[in-house]
From Swiss-Prot:
It is an enzyme of class 3 (hydrolase). The keyword Metal-binding applies. This is Endoribonuclease YbeY. Binds 1 zinc ion. PROSITE patterns: UPF0054 (PS01306). It comes from Vibrio cholerae serotype O1 (strain ATCC 39315 / El Tor Inaba N16961). Its EC number is 3.1.-.-. Zn(2+) binds at H113, H117, H123. The keyword Iron-sulfur does not apply. GO terms for molecular function: metalloendopeptidase activity; RNA endonuclease activity; zinc ion binding. Belongs to the endoribonuclease YbeY family.
Length: 154
């Protein structure tokens, strides 16, 4: 089993960000139950880049916490490239405070959530959302974090 991480830090200050080892662990714990080999780029960005990407790809005129860009290999070509995650530092930090969550747990949740999107999971329909949230909760708890949706369930 091997998950290859390409970590890109496109922020002014790297202080307080999770380590490359933490990002790699979160990816590995999320992806390897579904596929043994994968390459994922995780790009940490500021609000301006997140906003521009969110507007361009989703038509939403604001920054967002995580964007997932699954890689689609040309027909007949086998590659381990799963895709890219773009995570906005300021949004993650702000949401952790607003949702009263430990910052490290929220970073981990964004990696888990985004990775599941790369694997084909979605939350557009209620049944899909329930399945995806259940998986996220299970993975987070296996890594020692609390249920990321606990506040919404109370």
């Amino acid at each position: 089993m091997s998950i290859e991480l390409d970590l890109q830090l496109a922020v002014e200050n790297e202080h307080g960000l999770p380590s490359e080892a933490e990002f790699a662990l979160w990816l590995t714990r999320t992806i390897t139950p579904f596929q043994a080999q994968a390459e994922v780029t995780v790009r940490i960005v500021d609000e301006a880049e997140s906003h521009a990407l969110n507007l361009n790809y989703r038509g939403k005129d604001k920054p967002t916490n995580v964007l997932s860009f699954p890689f689609e290999a040309p027909s007949g070509m086998e590659m381990d490239l799963l895709g890219d995650l773009v995570i906005c530092r300021q949004v993650v930090e702000r949401e952790a405070i607003e949702q009263n969550k430990p910052l490290q747990a929220h970073w981990a949740h964004m990696v888990v959530h985004g990775s599941l999107h790369l694997l084909g999971y979605d939350h557009i329909e209620d049944d899909e959302a329930e399945e995806m949230e259940s998986l996220e909760t299970e993975i987070m708890q296996e890594m020692g974090f609390t249920d990321p949706y606990l506040a919404e369930k109370e």
